[in-house]
């Protein structure tokens, strides 16, 4: 008979951001526990609110299946003495297995006889297994923990009640001073204690007591209510899924409502208004059909519609001081100049072991100029880049960013425009933070992209210079995210930058621009290169590239991220070519022999007069044609051209002994192979490819 089981953990209200990951964790842990305990089940439905984590398991088996197990004991020579009597080792072994020496049989393993006992293990009833869920619950981990009373358990919030029902029967267990039963609690203010008669009654019973336990249903209810208000007022709403998720995990019985604020606050920049309402009050902003922000908001109450007018007035009243503060900061910030804000950065620390934020900008400016010149920016772009790099952190010392840190960069762009900076400079001030997450949007402007790369490179070089290198999961300054952002930007723009060479050049440029800072930019250069290679591997992993392709393109002296990314995609595009095995094997044979020859650059010379077979001339002509056509070809076309050399290469190896006794002939042949091997370098170490 299949059973249903309800588990509910009732808690003090949890922070909204931990509700969803917590219920996912509980579901995974319980599923793993049942699997480990050999209890079959069909499905687990997860439910969550700010005050509860619950699972409804369907199709549970009656019991564990019985198990017949053959248990290995000591060797026969240890189990019996010379007269064939059972030793203490044999007697102790059988006693431990709930058997007697009469149950012993011998089995040979690798030429040695061992004692074995056959055991029949009776499966435990499902209720007995479920009673062990207390350990599953208390083993959960959370980003923040707390204790309560005199108890030593660390948990996300105090546990107030537990429900454990197998069909209509309680499966009791204890966590601290709380015993699992059938009593749950409804809405904190609207509900009461609720007795659950049977596991499958759970959702309906709580809905009758003002709790929607199904998070998906609750979210849909919120969206429907908000959309109804939007339609009623002929508004438009930009759905903010992050805010919707947060609000959903703040309420158990949602009731949406609309409020208004004074029209005068619309004079504030939109990001300021939106931040004041969204981040501080969890309000949804609304617009008209022309996209203009309206002096109104939508919020969601954790309760019903009783006295909703008072709730609306209260929310409107709370919003006003927020908007007044924002208006004050905005007005006051415009009474100073950008240069005055920049000067204040001398007293803002980037890191106490590195420099002030002012000095960081000076380093970044030198880096940005060097980078801009290498990437071929126009004179106007270089001028805009220089100006942007001179001011791009200025908004950190404004009152608005001091109050709303999440607006850094955004307010920088707004203020820069108001202070007369051109569009390119203002946009770069905002874009230098991008991407703000691993999959975040990239800068859209050339100047902004160069500044973003330069700023992040400075952070990485600076922290590596003072030996503050990320290790394990420890990365307090988000250097991995910044390096990953650099890789993404370079690959997206197809900007070729040799990171190892650039770091050496950056050291010289920064030391000339800021000689007093004393940072050795070139310190730990190999570690910096490896750091970026690891970020490339991360990128390739997310692109689901084969491991051998990743190994091939990263096992190389090439430190140009854009080139490595392009090479990886070229190899991936050809991985299923019909003739790839023969083609790659021919090229890898060339590479290995060239490496074995180990000729110096000066010794690599091909003399046609030393050719002894037609195939040598054919390969020489083919390689030269390959090199001559290289400039006008894409990387994919270059790789295809290399693969097409396979017949010529194979004939060459058939007709010629590379390691000829004649030193001149040998070196001539090795020179030709070395030149060809050099043409494969752009694709990494082809020897790493697995071809079938």
From Swiss-Prot:
Entry similarity comment: Belongs to the class-II aminoacyl-tRNA synthetase family.
Q: EC number(s) per UniProt?
A: 6.1.1.14
Name-wise, this protein is Glycine--tRNA ligase beta subunit
Keywords for this protein:
Aminoacyl-tRNA synthetase, ATP-binding, Cytoplasm, Ligase, Nucleotide-binding, Protein biosynthesis
Quaternary structure per UniProt?
Tetramer of two alpha and two beta subunits.
Q: Record's InterPro entries? A: Gly-tRNA-synth_bsu, Gly-tRNA-synth_heterodimer
Cross-referenced SUPFAM superfamilies: HD-domain/PDEase-like
Molecular-function annotations in GO: ATP binding; glycine-tRNA ligase activity
The record's subcellular location field reads:
Cytoplasm
Source organism superkingdom: Bacteria
What's in the GO CC field?
cytosol
Catalyzed reaction equations: tRNA(Gly) + glycine + ATP = glycyl-tRNA(Gly) + AMP + diphosphate
PANTHER family membership? GLYCINE--TRNA LIGASE, CHLOROPLASTIC_MITOCHONDRIAL 2, GLYCYL-TRNA SYNTHETASE
Keyword Isomerase on entry: no
Enzyme class comes to ligase
- Which pairs of positions does the record mark as disulfide bonds? none
Tell me one GO biological process term: glycyl-tRNA aminoacylation
């Amino acid at each position: 008979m299949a059973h249903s089981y309800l588990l509910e953990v009732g808690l003090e209200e949890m922070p909204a951001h931990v509700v969803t990951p917590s219920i996912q964790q509980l579901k995974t842990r319980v599923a793993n526990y049942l699997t480990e305990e050999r209890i079959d089940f069909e499905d687990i439905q997860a439910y969550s609110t700010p005050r509860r984590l619950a699972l409804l398991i369907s199709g549970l088996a009656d019991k564990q299946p019985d198990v017949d197990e053959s248990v290995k004991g000591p060797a026969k020579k240890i189990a019996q003495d010379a007269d064939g009597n059972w030793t203490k080792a044999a007697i102790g072994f059988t006693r431990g297995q709930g058997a007697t020496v009469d149950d012993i049989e011998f089995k040979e393993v690798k030429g040695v006889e061992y004692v074995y006992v056959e055991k029949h293990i009776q499966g435990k009833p499902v209720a007995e297994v479920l009673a062990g869920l207390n350990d599953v619950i208390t083993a959960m981990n959370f980003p923040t923990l707390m204790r309560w009373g005199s108890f030593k358990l660390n948990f996300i919030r105090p546990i107030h009640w537990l429900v454990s029902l197998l069909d209509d029967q309680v499966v009791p267990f204890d966590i601290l001073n709380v015993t699992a039963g059938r009593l749950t609690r409804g809405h904190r203010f609207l509900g009461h204690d609720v007795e659950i008669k049977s596991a499958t009654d759970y959702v309906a019973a709580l809905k009758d007591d003002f709790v929607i336990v199904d998070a998906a249903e609750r979210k849909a209810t919120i969206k429907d209510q908000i959309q109804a208000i939007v339609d009623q007022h002929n508004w438009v709403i930009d759905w903010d899924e992050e805010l919707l998720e947060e609000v959903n995990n703040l309420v158990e019985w949602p009731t949406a409502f609309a409020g208004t604020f004074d029209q005068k606050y619309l004079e504030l920049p939109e990001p300021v208004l939106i931040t004041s309402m969204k981040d501080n009050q969890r309000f949804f902003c609304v617009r008209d059909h022309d996209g203009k922000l309206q002096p109104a908001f939508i919020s969601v109450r954790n309760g019903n519609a009783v006295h909703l007018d008072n709730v609306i007035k209260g929310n409107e009243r709370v919003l006003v001081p927020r908007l007044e503060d924002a208006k004050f900061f905005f007005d006051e910030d415009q009474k100073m100049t950008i240069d005055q804000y920049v000067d204040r950065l001398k007293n803002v620390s980037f890191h106490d072991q590195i420099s002030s934020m002012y000095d960081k900008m000076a380093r970044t400016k030198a880096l940005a100029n060097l980078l801009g010149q290498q990437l071929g920016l126009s004179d106007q772009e270089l001028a805009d880049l220089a100006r942007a790099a001179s001011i791009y952190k200025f908004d950190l010392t404004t009152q608005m960013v001091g109050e709303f840190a999440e607006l850094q960069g955004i307010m920088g762009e707004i203020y820069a425009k108001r202070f007369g900076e051109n569009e390119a400079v203002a946009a770069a001030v905002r874009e230098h933070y991008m991407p703000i997450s691993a999959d975040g949007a990239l800068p859209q402007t050339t100047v902004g992209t160069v500044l973003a790369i330069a700023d992040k490179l400075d952070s990485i070089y600076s922290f590596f210079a003072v030996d503050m290198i990320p290790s394990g999961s420890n990365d307090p300054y988000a250097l991995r995210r910044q390096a990953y952002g650099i890789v993404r930007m370079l690959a997206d723009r197809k900007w070729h930058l040799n990171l190892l060479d650039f770091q050496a050049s950056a050291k010289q440029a920064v030391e000339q621009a800021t000689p007093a800072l004393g940072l050795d930019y070139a310190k730990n250069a190999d570690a910096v290169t490896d750091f970026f290679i690891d970020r490339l591997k991360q990128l390739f992993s997310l692109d689901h590239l084969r491991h051998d392709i990743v190994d091939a393109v990263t096992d190389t002296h090439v430190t140009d991220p854009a080139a490595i990314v392009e090479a990886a995609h070229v190899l991936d595009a050809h991985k299923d070519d019909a003739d790839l095995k023969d083609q790659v094997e021919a090229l890898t044979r060339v590479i290995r022999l060239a490496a074995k020859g180990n000729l110096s650059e000066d010794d690599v010379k091909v003399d046609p007069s030393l050719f002894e077979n037609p195939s040598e001339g054919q390969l020489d002509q083919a390689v030269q044609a390959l090199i001559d056509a290289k400039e006008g070809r894409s990387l994919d076309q270059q790789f295809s051209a290399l693969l097409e050399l396979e017949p010529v290469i194979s004939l060459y190896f058939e007709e010629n002994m590379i390691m000829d006794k004649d030193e001149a002939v040998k070196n001539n042949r090795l020179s030709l192979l070395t030149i060809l091997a050099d043409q494969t370098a752009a694709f990494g170490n082809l020897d790493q490819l697995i071809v079938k």
